[in-house]
């Protein structure tokens, strides 16, 4: 199994599989967030079910490992590609025909996404799962009853226009990263015939758009709600 680490193909395969697993997590996370739009009580029930329970902690650790593996392999492959190009990377050349902008800027997009994840961990994970782990039951935030009040935290966070703008920039970067990464991962694991090439790109764009819009709708909804005094009925 050493070829997974030592060979370029092996590294790409590991990065592709870890990326697809992270996309599955994003799908679950987005679906869970949308619950808050229909019932904050149901959303908080889901937050309470997850919380700091052993299965949620195991899942969180597994997710962290996937994320670290994906980042490390992305960094290694980027360095490998730059080394292979040598001094050519400093030459000013036209964009190759058929090469997406996202594919040429995956590392830059990845940096923005990582920064966004740290922001997200600060705003939510640290105030929810981590707070439960350390026994912090009072977050000291008006309108938020405790670590399992996920809806209250969403409402509080996205009432701040700075966070709204930062999250939307993050989601925009995520769209570009996923729209290329999704079909590229499928291509790497074997879906690489000519018939499916364009189909996969189309499917990836549609699926990525659904995920990103799902997250963005929650951000925008709660921001508008805050502008309307806490209820859309007052707008």
Describe each PLM feature range.
Residues 1-235:
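Membrane-embedded alpha-helical bundles that constitute the cytochrome b-like, heme-associated redox core
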């Amino acid at each position: 199994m050493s070829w997974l680490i030592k060979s370029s193909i092996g590294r790409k395969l590991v990065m592709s599989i870890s990326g697809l697993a992270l996309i599955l997590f994003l799908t679950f996370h987005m679906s869970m967030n949308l619950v808050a739009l229909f019932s904050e009580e149901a959303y908080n029930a889901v937050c309470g079910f997850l919380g700091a329970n052993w299965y949620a902690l195991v899942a969180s650790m597994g997710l962290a490992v996937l994320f670290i593996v994906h980042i490390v392999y992305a960094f290694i492959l980027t360095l490998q590609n730059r080394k292979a190009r040598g001094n050519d990377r400093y030459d000013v050349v036209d964009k190759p025909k058929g090469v997406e902008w996202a594919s040429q800027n995956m590392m830059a997009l990845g940096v923005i996404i990582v920064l966004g994840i740290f922001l997200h961990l600060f705003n939510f994970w640290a105030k929810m799962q981590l707070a439960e782990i350390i026994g912090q039951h009072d977050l000291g935030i008006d309108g938020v009853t405790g670590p399992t009040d996920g809806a209250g935290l969403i409402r509080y966070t996205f009432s701040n226009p700075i966070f709204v703008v930062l999250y939307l920039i993050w989601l925009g970067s995520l769209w570009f990263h996923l729209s290329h990464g999704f079909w590229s991962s499928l291509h790497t694991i074997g879906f690489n015939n000519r018939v499916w090439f364009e189909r996969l790109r189309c499917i990836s764009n549609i699926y990525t758009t659904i995920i990103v819009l799902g997250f963005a709708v929650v951000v925008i909804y709660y921001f508008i709600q805050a502008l309307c005094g806490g209820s859309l009925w007052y707008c």
